[in-house]
């Protein structure tokens, strides 16, 4: 991690500026006692960011063996900084202090990371930040496989294609509040044009505008206008390109920040507690999981702090 990658977050390293920022955000969000809460939280906010920076800096120079642990705890600190812009009393009770995610008991033989699952718990940080940052509270007890989560990271698309000769996402053209979806997506979804427009309107609040011989044009929902809040569009930060899942079953309806959290939680737990399998993977390169995990960590190390800074600076 370089200074350039953290410089937007470092803008907040002043109590005076941060107090003004938090007061403004609390007023915008209709939170009572904005001035009092901004005064109370300004130093905490900075501490969360600086602690996150320490974890990310250490991760940048650490070996792959421990990198996921450092990245996960750095990510958690960034989430807490974002959280107190929406929930000034965080943590108001101890139940929100847990990670809020569980993994199934790992089998010692024939274990496959891509098939492993995470489950979102009723209490904890995960469901709390999903509710306060993204307005989603219907994800309790949902389960996601690692493969499905990794497939939603556009920067990993070429790796999946190399390994499986299959594209899991299709390019779309975004211009401000509009998205052009090519006809091949509609065909892959096994829908008529009108049914596809109805589907996107019902599930993602997209508004159909017009159709031409190459595809359909939509006005997208406010949530999908920014990559860090979108639950339907996938954004490749390296290529500056938007995508949509190639199959409707691949929609997770999760913001990418949550996807990173779920993957990193599991990889971090493996690095901490499944030492034998972890080192076999890293030293023997026993499966395709090695490349996916390694590349995901490289992507997340840069992308998550960027999304956190964009979330904070959009106010």
Swiss-Prot record:
It holds the Pfam family YaaC. It comes from the Bacteria. InterPro entries: YaaC-like. This is Uncharacterized protein YaaC. It comes from Bacillus subtilis (strain 168).
């Amino acid at each position: 991690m370089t200074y350039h990658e953290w410089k937007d977050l470092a803008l907040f390293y002043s109590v005076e500026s941060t107090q003004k920022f938090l007061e403004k955000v609390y007023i915008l969000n209709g939170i009572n006692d904005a001035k009092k809460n901004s005064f109370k939280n300004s130093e905490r906010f900075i501490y969360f960011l600086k602690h996150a920076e320490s974890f990310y800096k250490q991760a940048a120079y650490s070996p792959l063996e421990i990198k996921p642990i450092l990245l996960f705890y750095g990510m958690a600190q960034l989430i807490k900084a974002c959280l107190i812009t929406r929930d000034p009393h965080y943590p108001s009770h101890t139940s929100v202090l847990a990670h809020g995610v569980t993994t199934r008991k790992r089998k010692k033989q024939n274990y496959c990371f891509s098939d492993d699952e995470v489950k979102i718990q009723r209490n904890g940080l995960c469901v709390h930040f999903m509710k306060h940052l993204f307005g989603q509270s219907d994800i309790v007890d949902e389960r996601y496989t690692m493969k499905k989560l990794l497939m939603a990271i556009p920067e990993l698309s070429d790796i999946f294609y190399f390994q499986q000769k299959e594209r899991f996402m299709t390019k779309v053209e975004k211009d401000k509040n509009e998205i052009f979806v090519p006809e091949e997506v509609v065909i892959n979804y096994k829908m008529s044009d009108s049914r596809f427009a109805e589907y996107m309107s019902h599930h993602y609040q997209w508004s159909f505008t017009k159709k031409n011989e190459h595809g359909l044009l939509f006005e997208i929902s406010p949530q999908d206008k920014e990559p860090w809040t979108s639950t339907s569009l996938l954004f490749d930060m390296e290529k500056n390109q938007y995508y949509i899942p190639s199959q409707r079953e691949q929609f997770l309806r999760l913001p990418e920040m949550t996807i990173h959290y779920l993957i990193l939680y599991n990889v971090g737990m493996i690095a901490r507690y499944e030492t034998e399998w972890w080192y076999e993977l890293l030293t023997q390169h026993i499966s395709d999981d090695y490349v996916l995990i390694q590349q995901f960590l490289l992507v997340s190390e840069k992308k998550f702090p960027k999304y956190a800074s964009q979330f904070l600076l959009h106010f």
